[in-house]
C-alpha cells in the first residue's frame, strides 16, 4: 500500500496546519484520490497491523441497520464506544441511513437493497449511489458521517466503487475505511454476479492529527509488504445474510501495530 504512505508524505509536505472540532489540531490537505485494483489483492495496510475482525463486524453492523453498539460490544469491538450515550445509542448514523432513510411521507428507503436491485437491472445507471449524509438528521447523530456517500459503477462485467469521505483521520481511520469499502464492494459484486473492478477513495479534508506525528514517522520508516487475499467462503441469499465466518483473510504479514490516541 505505497499509495497510503505517499498520501502521508503529501500531507506532511504540502498540508496546512488547522484547528479542528476536537481541539487536537491537524495538518490537512483538501482533495486527494487513490485507486485500488481489487483483482490484485485486498487493500489492507501492511506497514502496521490492522484489526480486520473489527472492520468486518462494523460493516456487518452497518448492514443490519443497527445504531446501538451492543452488537459491537458483544463482539469485543470498541471503535464506537467514545461516541455512544449511556444506553449505547448513536442516533441515526450509517446503519440507519443505509437501511431506513426516512421520507416525508413517513416511510423509509432501504438504500442498500435499492442499489443492489438497480445494479442488477440497470448496470449502466449513473445513480447507483448510497448516501449517509442526511442533512435533516445530522443534529441527531452522535457523529456526522465521515464517509458520506458512495457510488457503484459497472463496466466490462466488473463492479467498481468510489467513496467520498468528507473528513479523514489518515493515521487511524483511513486503513479501516479502505478495507471496509473494499470488502463491501466484494460482497455486492458477489451478490450481483460481477467480477471485481476498482475501489476509488476520494477525500475532502484529509488530515493527520498533531498527536499522530511520531506514529506517522514510524510507519513511513517501514517498507510495505505484499497485499493479503480476502476470500468470501459462501454466497448467501442476500447481502444481509453474511456472517463473520464467511470471510477469510490470508497471507497477511503486517508490521507490528502502532498505538495512537483517538480524537473525539
Curated annotation (Swiss-Prot):
Pathway(s) where this gene product acts: Pyrimidine metabolism; dTTP biosynthesis
Keyword Transferase on entry: yes
Residues holding dUMP: 21, 126-127, 166-169, 177, 207-209
One Pfam family, short name: Thymidylat_synt
InterPro entries associated with the record: Thymidate_synth/dCMP_Mease, Thymidate_synth/dCMP_Mease_dom, Thymidate_synth/dCMP_Mease_sf, Thymidylate_synthase, Thymidylate_synthase_AS
Active site residues according to the UniProt entry: 146
Enzyme class: transferase
Transferase keyword on record: yes
Keyword annotations of the record: Cytoplasm, Methyltransferase, Nucleotide biosynthesis, Transferase
Signal peptide residues on this chain, from the entry's feature table: none
Major location category of this protein: cytoplasm
UniProt-listed Enzyme Commission number(s): 2.1.1.45
GO cellular component: a single term: cytosol
Gene3D superfamilies reported in the protein's UniProt record: Thymidylate synthase/dCMP hydroxymethylase domain
GO terms under biological process: dTMP biosynthetic process; dTTP biosynthetic process; methylation
Catalysed reactions listed for this entry: dUMP + (6R)-5,10-methylene-5,6,7,8-tetrahydrofolate = 7,8-dihydrofolate + dTMP
GO MF, one annotated term: thymidylate synthase activity
UniProt-annotated location(s): Cytoplasm
Binding site for (6R)-5,10-methylene-5,6,7,8-tetrahydrofolate: 51, 169, 263
Homology family: Belongs to the thymidylate synthase family. Bacterial-type ThyA subfamily.
Protein's job: Catalyzes the reductive methylation of 2'-deoxyuridine-5'-monophosphate (dUMP) to 2'-deoxythymidine-5'-monophosphate (dTMP) while utilizing 5,10-methylenetetrahydrofolate (mTHF) as the methyl donor and reductant in the reaction, yielding dihydrofolate (DHF) as a by-product. This enzymatic reaction provides an intracellular de novo source of dTMP, an essential precursor for DNA biosynthesis.
Subunit (UniProt): Homodimer.
Entries under PANTHER family matching the protein: THYMIDYLATE SYNTHASE (PTHR11548:SF9), THYMIDYLATE SYNTHASE 1 (PTHR11548)
Identification of the protein by name: Thymidylate synthase
Gene: thyA
